[in-house]
């Protein structure tokens, strides 16, 4: 394919960035930057950088599995060293070991032997069994005195068990943990070891150390010859030695260095200076909204609040209001007053300061009435030491020469820190004094370092460089921005540099998984509220034709909140006439033309005549609030007695407001992610537009508003194309377009459409039937065809999915707009990022018995709390234990096949006399097992986990698929067997030199399969190893095609053609892959 070389285009690039997608659109603009035509658009989709169901890091599962493997390996090595020690000290002889180095005929009653060792001499084998058992099960060793105050529930349960057993040993009823286990655990609960999620049988390693010492003493008394000092020292070392936690320099190395002082390490968050910096940032940014104006705190107010967080454990907004003596009409900016008791939320909490103070109080080292008397420098040192070091020993080593022993002991008992900030203590100590004078953080940084972001790279290049991972720590955001960068650079390579870039990021970008779930929860609640409101509307208006629209429902909602009265006149509104055209109107209390505020908090229900009289004035101006007129007082009373939320009342009653500030806030999205990306692009990319501000972050609410006004229908559930729709709107949100809309709304508010009106600013004739300004004529029709390939995007039409069909459709439907058909028009094809990662989980976690693998069967031990009725039918020895089978079945059926509920209470077997006997916790279940991964020296088998690649071969006009798993990659195995339907792996087709290698497939590689019946073109989703069929994902994931956008069970062996394609990040360059040699797995 020849390289695409377009003519020079003056265009705006619009981006709609989500956590798993980037929609993009190019809109050409004229010299005044008015949108004039749609050049190109598309969607890039990728996997979010987290576990979808839990929000966990993708690395967490690997990290936990690696941790378990390390523990297992270290335990095995510890036991090996113990066996070697026993042989070296003469406890055991060479004849006692088998060919694998394991001890022959080792007694299997170690708990009983540990108790017996207190009263009699043990044989060498018995003594070996005891010592090995202590080394294998060596309890829990805490390295911090204050570990019991953890918020980790699992660790808390473990520590509770350790403490309880330590207390039981101190009573003197039991000499050792072994005696306690035999005489208490086994008798009371029937088992000695911990069970699932129960840590009540855990011992402290120090208690086990005491038992070891006592055992050596007793065995020496009984004449055991194998109690030498060397053996005791070696065993005790193996018992007590533990790898130190990552701390000190290792932690600092991982954290990196200061933004402003590159040679300095980042400061601990729980230092005095860092906490004061955080407080000063909040204090200096705090704004009061009062009588319509916004203001910062005065110097006196700042001084009043400055030391309050040190006096109170938590400083709330309500406390701040009282201290500042604010009037009831004053509010804190940024606080969500919609929720109950909003001002009860915390303004500032000095966690470290008060943690240190409480620790000293608990140990009687601080007078409750006096302030903390440790210097700021010493508190910084304490915060740093307790954040960097993870053991009492290391912390003591750092602080022993700085603070008194009794204070250090108190702190070790009660505090633990771990968080860090991005700035060093050195930088903070330079910045904080300026912030204490009232300067904002950015102002203080600019004064000291010259720039808020430290050393800034201002070199402009044609292409955007990589997003710095050290500045964007959230992996979900980093991947989204990195994919956006690929799209930007792809557009520039294809079309040249844009004049401007407009960006909208989805609300969830930059939010934690928990926050995103909260957003989803609120959206679901809002959806249910709308359904209830719609049902209520139909009750009030049973004769209403069709489904009520959001505007109809909003009228009823405002009617109820305003107690059925017009907010401007106070007159009663006739509910029966609510839907009568012109009778009532929804008005923007603060004129939209002056604020661009279309939020619910700016909407009121008024009689049509009152709305016309008000025009584009604020209520304060309309009712002559400046002179405190009677009308203004009555209006205030109506607002105050309404059921509006507090924040809405505040907005409606605004007396003064900054129009430019309102527009700036409502048109721009100032979240950190947007600010970062805008600044990053502006500083590093060469853009051709006029003026300084050439990168703009659009507000999502404005995008929704314009999309609705411009007649663009968006249904998220249908397919992935809708991301491009928003990108078009974002691109068209130019300053020139905003000005047009502002003028239109202003004239409409002023009821200026009386016949013909001349716009004095432009000379444009405005007619009474003038519609909302569009970017260009037939805008909605053109955009919907370009995005969905159908007239108005309606599903009943056939999609114009080829270049010729799309241009023909545009020419037919938009005959009056020939500009819609041009050389850059191409069908939208969603680009999906392929996953070519070759590593992954080696095998599934569950290991099954492989004794009957030759029968095609494996045996799995299934806990009763996970046993379903279908599993029960495959229970091993079902015929030999019919009573057990029937009892389990009855319990499950009684609880509707919910095993968690069915076996919440213990389940027991009963003898012939009906007496309760053994507790049943799990049963063995047969499973079909054709293949898998051998583990545990070929004694167990586990299911295959990740299929990372499928290699495609061809021979005699037939195609053969060879699946490759991550465990094969790890071992460097390149498989040579192709799937044969219904056959075991050993009977699969052997691939030799007579087969031709075609290509390798990874998830989301673009493929084409042509059969006698159909042509399928989409992204490879998966391969079924039992049938050799593949699943193909439709490019836009149209849920009306296949199963939720996926074509399943496509046979490729006898396909007429099977081809892999390459696609760029824009979905524009699609070409067949070139033939290559078969790649290795590593």
Curated annotation (Swiss-Prot):
Q: How is it used?
A: Coexpression with both gRNAs or a synthetic gRNA in human embryonic or pluripotent stem cells shows it is possible to target and modify a DNA sequence of interest.
Name the consequence of residue 588 to A: Does not restore CRISPR interference during plasmid transformation to deletion mutant
EC main group? hydrolase
Question: What is its cofactor?
Answer: Mg(2+)
Q: What is the effect of changing residue 16 to A?
A: Does not restore CRISPR interference during plasmid transformation to deletion mutant
* Cited InterPro entries: Cas9 (IPR028629), HNH_CAS9 (IPR033114), HNH_nuc (IPR003615), RNaseH_sf (IPR036397), RuvC_III (IPR041383)
Question: What GO molecular function terms would the record report?
Answer: DNA binding; endonuclease activity; metal ion binding; RNA binding
Q: Which NCBIfam families match?
A: cas_Csn1
- Subunit annotation: Monomer. Binds crRNA and tracrRNA.
UniProt-recorded name of the protein = CRISPR-associated endonuclease Cas9
Instruction: Report the source organism.
Output: Neisseria meningitidis serogroup C (strain 8013)
- Underlying gene: cas9
